[in-house]
Amino acid sequence: MLSSVVFWGLIALIGTSRGSYPFSHSMKPHLHPRLYHGCYGDIMTMKTSGATCDANSVMNCGIRGSEMFAEMDLRAIKPYQTLIKEVGQRHCVDPAVIAAIISRESHGGSVLQDGWDHRGLKFGLMQLDKQTYHPVGAWDSKEHLSQATGILTERIKAIQKKFPTWSVAQHLKGGLSAFKSGIEAIATPSDIDNDFVNDIIARAKFYKRQSF
């Protein structure tokens, strides 16, 4: 009788031990949205100086300036949060980076005229140049966001190939810079230390804290 009790006690103990693991090898963990950062590095660990300071923007620059503008655009961008997350996961890009580009380029679409910038040259939430990229879909559609995010990933991969010894952070920053100004303009790490890239990373960190 005693041996039987000991046996079942051991079985219960083993079961409890296995149950202490958060998930088995056959199960995938359910990641909190704030933990998802895609395939191109964790932006929360990346250094940035924020928007460039100059004589005309002493008060609205640096990390505080970037965060201020990101917060101002939050209300306009919030309705696209689910869409941004879907597109981000499809392309393995941090949704916060997509949100940051939307903030920087179109203020969440609030300054666009039928999807176009004031010169009629760039289209959509992420502002694709019509001559370079030939935008598709409605300006605030999943099709547009997917096209633009796909272009961003192409640029990141091109930088990875061109500069294989660069760090993960440099590859992402290089891809962002190439998305804005082209790959040809990038030759050294100093070329990716620019206003656009630093501003995007700072804004992205803000949006990551807002659960993007």
Curated annotation (Swiss-Prot):
Its EC number is 3.2.1.-. GO terms for cellular component: extracellular region. It comes from the Eukaryota. Disulfide bonds join C39-C92, C53-C61. It is an enzyme of class 3 (hydrolase). The active site is at E105. Residues 1-19 form the signal peptide. Strong expression detected in the eye and weak expression in the testis. No expression is observed in any other tissues. GO terms for biological process: defense response to bacterium; defense response to Gram-positive bacterium; peptidoglycan catabolic process. GO terms for molecular function: lysozyme activity. Transmembrane segments: none annotated. Keywords: Disulfide bond, Glycosidase, Hydrolase, Secreted, Signal. It is found in: Secreted. Its main location: secreted. May act as a potent antibacterial protein that may play a role in the innate immunity. Belongs to the glycosyl hydrolase 23 family. PANTHER family: LYSOZYME G FAMILY MEMBER, LYSOZYME G-LIKE PROTEIN 2. This is Lysozyme g-like protein 2. The lineage of its organism: Eukaryota, Metazoa, Chordata, Craniata, Vertebrata. The gene is LYG2.
